[in-house]
Amino acid sequence: IYSSFSRREVLVAQLEVRAGNPPSGVHLLVQSQRMERFHLLDDFWVTWQQWFTELEETHTSLGVLSFFRSPQAHRSWVTASGAVLDGASLRLAAVDMPFDPEAGICVRAGFFALRAIADYYGIPYDPEPRPGDPISITKDEFLQACDDLVDAGIPVRDDRDAAWVDFTGWRVNYDVPLLSLAGFIMTPYAPWSSDRSFRFRRAGLRRRPTRP
């Protein structure tokens, strides 16, 4: 258990350098640009693909790990997940650069993991959301994020309406599981996740038996 917890927390702690405190997807992209490492984000997405895959395996076979808090109170594996997924979704939807397949795979790995953990605790969500379904992020928040990217020197698509539609199409896959887990585990504050999380009573959720 400790080795799984420790591996999880190494990347959560490292993320603060890129994504700030509290972590955010916007800050992740902005800081990468400022550090002249935007072109190296492919490697970052691959690293987090692997992290999400291991998260799914460990946190559904050893469910208690979900409640093991980070050594630093302001950090959380849930809000770290949200920041990385939002960063990847913004890269895919808003940034005016060629499609980044590794960012897309990272989003898929992430929502697979969050959904699996939500399933473990009986947390409901729509397993087949459609791109037009509502999400918890407002269009104004998204447009402000685009402005922040532009201010940092990151090229953003001229058609912000189309970018918004694309962003919702990515975010809808993990929006409810992310916010639900943030509320269920009572994570520290972070934008676009625990700041608007759903509150679930632990006693009202059915937990699946631990795998043998």
Q: Which stretches of residues belong to each language-model region?
A:
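Soluble C-terminal extramembrane regulatory/interaction domains of multi-pass membrane proteins
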Residues: 44, 66-69, 73-212
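Transmembrane alpha-helices and immediately adjacent membrane-cytoplasm interface residues
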Residues: 1-2
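Non-transmembrane accessory domains of multi-pass membrane transporters/channels
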Residues: 7-81, 86-87, 96
